[in-house]
Amino acid sequence: MKFIVDQQVEDIEMPENLKLNTFLKEFHSVCPHSECSFGLYGFAFGQSPFPVPLLMQEALMKNANQGAYAPVPGIPELRNAISKYNKHYFGMDIAPERIYVGPGTKELIFNLLEILHGTVILPTPAWLGYLPQIRLLKKNYHMLPTNTNKKISPIDLKKLSLRLQDRQKILILNNPNNPTGLLHNRLELEEIADVCREQNITVISDEIYAQTTYDFSKFVSMGKIYPEGTFITNGLSKSHAAGGYRLGYVIFPQHAVDLKRQFKKILATEYTAVSTPIQYAAVAGFEISKEIDIYFDATRSIHQIMGEYTYNALSAIEGIKATKPDATFYLLADFNAFATELQKVKINTSQKLSEALIVHPYHIAIVGGDSLVLERTDFSARIAYVDYNGTKVLQNYFDNKPKTSSERIEFVKNNAPKVVAGIEMICTFFKNLRKESLNDLQTQKKKV
């Protein structure tokens, strides 16, 4: 029997990070070089490398017998814990009734896009997961290219909004940002919020990286600035290194009573409820404790140390520009200065650059600009600096915290050798590219 797939599903591409997994398996199976067996320099995979906090692991084991369905919005203990968590860390008074729990923020953002009417405004570069969801739902959307410092321009946001006919528009705000690692500060958020109020723009504020903000005092939730029009999403995957637990939450605006009813209907229809044992484990993760505070401080500091090293090392390579991260475990590297040399060797899209970097002898895995909703010919890439043993590195950090600049550099070299070697290999790739381009030029001159 021949099965026919719905065309809108056919048109959706596999997210770049998952597609890369498949490609790597195929590549290593046919690579004839012995060096291929070592693996790759993993700058493509955005997963926190640290262990799940022990108190969450223990809570999960303790509640493994919880086999009953949970309430659709989440168990009361968890919604209460999330309410207190937001008060303690983000200074927001959130009634538990405004909190809905789901199987990860990715699914919750999809659910919000399902129920909210209006054209979606997507700032670019963007996390690679937003656009496939928007397309799957057949929603109208417009890109909003960020300004030269890779942040949202309120002026450009207003200009775009004035061109749209919808009574309600939806802005996806990812703060801190994946892929740039940048943070919108309070003043910048206030300027964006002013436009949103004036233009009736609803905000989905994806704050999954909030706890990774290096100077945590600088993080401000959009929910504090624009509470009447902001849906906040957050979860366990980045702050608690528990992406596999698949648990996130959304905070509704205070007066969105009818919308909550509609949302509950969607959740009940699509997945009933999040795994009950996982919810009890999440209670332990969101409860205020000294253990969790220590965990946040340490992992945040390690991300910062790795980010500083990666930024400085890439910026030291002639022709490469990079965003200096304020948070997350990513930065955006700009290789467009090499565009002429790349095109000479028939690398004319960011996808082809990604493919050229992964093959022998380079073995460099990145997420290219086209996957980040940039132009296909934009030679930018997301660089994730988490290719190390997080359990071991966390223990080494506790044993001997680096204090000086030189100690921080040594910490990276000793604990993240693949990050260090991978950046050196990026340098080698572009040196070889320029050498090849120079040789071609000399050959052409001889012919003349």
What are these regions (language model features)?
Residues 343-347, 356-365, 371-448:
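PLP-dependent enzyme catalytic core of the Aspartate aminotransferase-like
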